[in-house]
Regions:
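Short, hydrophobic/aromatic-rich segments at coil-to-beta transitions
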Residues: 14-23, 96-103, 119-122, 142-148
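Hydrophobic/aromatic beta-strand elements that line small-molecule binding cavities or substrate pockets
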Residues: 2-11, 33-34, 132-138, 159-165
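An acidic-aromatic
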Residues: 6-70, 155-157
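Non-transmembrane domains of secretory- and envelope-associated proteins
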Residues: 121-133, 141-200
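A short, structured loop/turn motif at beta-sheet edges
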Residues: 90-100, 137-144, 166-168
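Short helix-loop boundary/capping segments
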Residues: 92-131
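Short solvent-exposed loop/turn micro-motifs enriched in small/polar/acidic residues
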Residues: 26-29, 84-86, 128-131
Length: 200
């Protein structure tokens, strides 16, 4: 499936987990709130029933925060991991004219996912091919990545970033609740309840 968002992403050094705060907005007018994270909570919405759910990550404690980081944060952490890790990896950088193609192959005993920092997933009760592959396409003109591909044995995902505008605001001016619709019922997120098409 294909999903399109307008994303406002802020580097957030105070957040030691993801390292970024962000909101996903609908592409029709760039105003409809879809999802948000502010370094402390993630905010999910169901427009059909006018409901907001807030997850402060305490109901179901995990060693990572279960959300997909925004594009540039994700790419930055892939590169940082490749430069700093002592894991078994193979990297290649191909000059493709107007862009570079970077490929990272992780040969560990378990798959590696990025929730901000890299996290070695626990082995499942059945065999899963553990190789993890990440690829980045990087513009030479501005040094920014514009495409990311993640390949696991069970799933392949691709994310493309276009029409980039450099954010001139600072993180101290970001409030995720400024983007949340007014008049919606607010509830605490329940991991045991059906999601009912909550945007994430």
């Amino acid at each position: 499936s294909i999903r399109k968002y307008i994303v406002k992403e802020f580097d957030d050094p105070a957040d030691s987990t993801i390292g970024a705060s962000f909101v996903n907005l609908g592409t029709d007018d760039g105003k409809e709130f879809q999802f948000g994270y502010n370094g402390e909570v993630r905010v999910l919405v169901n427009h059909a029933v006018k409901e907001i759910k807030i997850d402060n990550f305490t109901t179901r404690p995990l060693p990572f925060r279960p959300l997909t980081p925004p594009f540039f944060n994700y790419c930055k952490n892939i590169v940082r991991y490749a430069l700093e890790t002592e894991d078994s990896i193979v990297t290649t950088l191909e000059d493709c004219g107007d862009y570079f193609h970077f490929k990272l192959v992780i040969n560990e005993d378990t798959q590696v996912e990025f929730f901000g920092k890299a996290y070695h997933m626990p082995p499942p009760p059945f065999y899963v091919e553990p190789t993890s592959i990440y690829e980045l396409w990087i513009h030479k003109s501005n040094g920014l990545p514009y495409k990311k591909r993640r390949a696991m044995s069970h799933n392949i995902s691709v994310e493309t970033c276009c029409n980039v505008e450099i954010n001139k605001e600072t993180i101290d001016r970001f409030d995720v609740f400024d983007y949340v619709p007014q008049g919606y019922e607010t509830k605490k997120y329940d991991y045991g309840a059906p999601s009912r098409n909550m945007a994430a």
